[in-house]
Amino acid sequence: MKKTASLIQYIYLLFLAVITACGDAFFRGDSNGTAALAAKILIYCFLFYAFFLLAEKALASLQEPAERHGWYQVFQYNWKNVLRISLLLFAVYFAYLLVFYPGATTGDTVYQIEDLFTGTSPIAYPVNYGHTKVQALMIDHHPVTTTLIFTFFYRIGLLLGDANIGLFLYNLLQSACMSILFASIVCYMDSLGIPKPIALISTVFYASPVVASYAVTMGKDMLFSFWFVLYYLVFFQIATNPNDEGSEKKQWVLLAVLSVLIALMNKKGMYLALLSNLCLLLVVPGKMKINAVVTALLPVFILAVVMQQILFPLLNIMPGGKQEVLGTAFQQTALSLIEHPEKYTEGEKQLFFTILDCSPEELAEVYSPTCTDPVKNRFRLETDNSVILSYLKMWARHFICEPGTYIRAIFSVNGGYYAPLKGFNVYQYVPYSEVLNAFSQPDRTASLRITLGAFLAWLENIPAFSVFCQDSFYTFWYPAFSLYLFCKKKQRKKIILLAPLAGNLLFLTIGPLCYTRYALCQIYTFPVLLAVTAGAVQEKKEE
């Protein structure tokens, strides 16, 4: 039995090493051949083995009796401690907000506000429609719910005489809400019997520069991540206490509401809720399985039927383009055509270039190995669904024939979510919009902004510590360790807790760009996963 378990463990390590080595080689753009890739696989096998061993020992060392230190009482689960830690975190976030006043935002956010505010919206993507305007309330290129929220605060700023005030108020409110949420998570660990050092580590983590930077940044991914954490906590409650009477009522209602909210904040939220809630069928008993199905399908009904079929036509909202869904497929086909044009018939080439506003001669110049946007933004909006279906059949045929090329196209973009190559990206500035006559940051704090940015860059380059400043640690390495630990400790029911995280990793893998904000929901939930794995070690010791 032990030999079988060891064999499975080694196969698992090899599997992780192969994925990570591919992510490493292709994300770097290495072309050193099979031998170099094999060497990386062996190195990553050793690194994963060492990481699993060290992580388990580190968690075991934290199993310390609470009475040894009086300061452990700070993390006991009561409203006073939640308030204290909330104020501490808010003080950190508020300091960041003052330095980066009125806070940071993204180019996408500015476009969203321009979209709704002007009423005559430019079609930002694809490129060949860059000068086309449509008479619409807004475009669903970005989630309309977040567009409404961001524009609401922009208008508040205008009413108060300065658009910067609206951005500041939004980031102030977001910082306060995140402070309360994160403090509640830290103190909630006490009710789970988690070792108190985990609560301390989590508090320091939530006060870290990367979390503070995103707490004062207006953007759809930040807003989605906030609601995702709440969703994950309720998902955690139901998955770990499937027979609890409370979960049969209040928890299921909360899960349904939060499933809809994460879908409204980010389109991938609909698919995450669908897949994750259906996974609850594996752990919940009897009639509760109906609840799991309902909560899974509700976001699909709201977004695909109520919004797309009823509200959008009624309110004159233009649906988003299909290129967002097809971007990864376009990227794979583009790379395959560039490297192996002889494998495509003239009819297949004509089909692909009918969908994209791009000639075969231009493709190599348009293609970017690290981002899908340049290729997908050439999509012709008027393309018929039957043409897209024909293309997908062609894509599937070539995927089977050229899996290596297609996989390389994916990892060239998003290998940084698997291999420890990419540090955190944060937003510390605001893009100015001539259309909105906003936003801007004062010159008097420029030196402080530069100093904090340099400090974060310095942290990311400290040996050993830099491991915790990598996207891949939160998106792949620690979840992979968690799966290993749950299986080793025979706590397989906890594997279900990885479903939302695995779903998000899937979307990261086929995403348009390797950027921290897309992985933010997994970074925010890391302390929860840390607590669960610490609890797994503790429960085993008590058996």
Predicted segment positions?
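Transmembrane-helix motifs of polytopic, lipid-linked glycan transferases
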Residues: 50, 169-192
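Membrane-proximal lumenal/periplasmic loop motifs of glycosylation machinery
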Residues: 99-106, 120-177
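Short acidic/glycine- and proline-prone juxtamembrane loop motifs at membrane-interface regions
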Residues: 107, 213-223
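Membrane-interface alpha helices of multi-pass inner-membrane proteins
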Residues: 251-266, 277-278, 299-303
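Membrane-proximal stem/loop segments at transmembrane-domain junctions that anchor or position
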Residues: 316-445
